[in-house]
C-alpha cells in the first residue's frame, strides 16, 4: 500500500484540474506555489466538513473563568484543547450531552467553551497535520477540496470547471460519511 504523502495529495488535486504534477514541495512553479498557499486551508476545511474517525478525540476540559454576560445561559467556561479544530459534543460527567457555545475569552486571545456541565468531556475533531494519519477516503476528499481552491488561480477563473469541482466535492461527502460512519458504533447513552 502506498504511503500517503502531501505531494501525492497535491498531485491528485492537480490531476483533478488537468494541471502539471510536481516533484517537490519547494518547486518554484505556479502549481507548487498555489498548493503551498492553499494546503492548510483545504486540510482544515475538509476536516471540519465531517467528523472523520481518524481525527476524533475526547478530552476532559480545564475550567477557566466564565466571562461576564453569559451567567444567565451558562455556568462554566473551559479552555479548548490546543489542536481542537471543531467541537462536536460536550458531555456532563462524560455521559450526558449538554448544550454549549464557543466564545472569546475576556482578553480576546483564545476561544473558550461555555456550558452548564460542571465536569465536561469534549468530543472534537483534532487538527491532524500529518498525512500518514489520514485514511485513503479522507485523502481523496482533501484532494478534491484542494482542487476546488486551486482552480481559480491555476485555471484563470474557469467558472464552469470551478463549479464542477465544487459539485464533485459536495457530491462525494455523503458517500464518505456513509463509509466512515459504518466503521463505528457508538454506545447508547444511559436513560436519564
Language model feature labels by segment:
Residues 1-37, 192:
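Short, extreme N-terminal leader segments that mark the start of a protein/domain
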Residues 1-3, 8-9, 93-192:
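Internal mixed-charge
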Residues 13, 17-21, 46, 50, ...:
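A generic secondary-structure signal for well-formed alpha-helical elements
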Residues 20, 85-89, 111-113:
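Generic detector of short, locally flexible boundary/turn motifs and exposed helical patches
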Residues 25, 54-60, 187-189:
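Short coil/turn segments at secondary-structure boundaries
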Residues 27-46, 160-178:
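Short secondary-structure subsegments characteristic of cysteine-rich extracellular domains
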Residues 33-106, 134-150, 154:
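Divalent metal-cofactor coordination and adjacent catalytic microenvironments
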Amino acid at each position: 500500500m502506498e504511503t500517503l504523502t502531501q505531494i501525492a495529495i497535491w498531485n491528485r488535486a492537480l490531476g483533478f484540474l488537468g494541471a502539471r504534477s510536481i516533484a517537490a514541495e519547494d518547486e518554484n512553479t505556479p502549481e507548487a506555489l498555489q498548493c503551498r498557499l492553499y494546503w492548510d486551508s483545504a486540510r482544515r476545511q475538509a476536516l471540519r466538513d465531517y467528523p472523520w474517525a481518524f481525527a476524533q478525540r475526547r478530552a476532559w476540559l480545564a475550567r477557566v473563568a466564565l466571562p461576564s454576560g453569559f451567567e444567565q445561559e451558562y455556568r462554566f467556561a473551559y479552555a479548548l484543547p490546543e489542536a481542537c479544530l471543531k467541537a462536536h459534543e460536550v458531555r456532563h460527567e462524560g455521559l450526558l450531552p449538554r448544550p454549549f457555545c464557543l466564545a472569546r475569552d475576556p482578553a480576546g486571545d483564545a476561544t473558550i467553551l461555555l456550558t452548564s456541565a460542571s465536569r465536561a468531556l469534549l468530543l472534537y475533531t483534532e487538527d491532524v497535520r500529518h498525512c500518514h494519519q489520514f485514511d485513503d477516503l479522507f485523502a481523496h476528499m482533501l484532494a478534491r477540496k484542494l482542487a476546488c481552491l486551486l482552480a481559480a488561480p491555476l485555471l484563470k477563473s474557469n467558472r464552469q470547471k470551478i463549479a464542477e469541482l465544487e459539485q464533485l466535492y459536495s457530491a462525494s461527502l455523503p458517500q464518505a460519511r456513509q463509509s466512515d460512519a459504518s466503521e463505528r458504533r457508538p454506545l447508547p447513552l444511559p436513560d436519564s
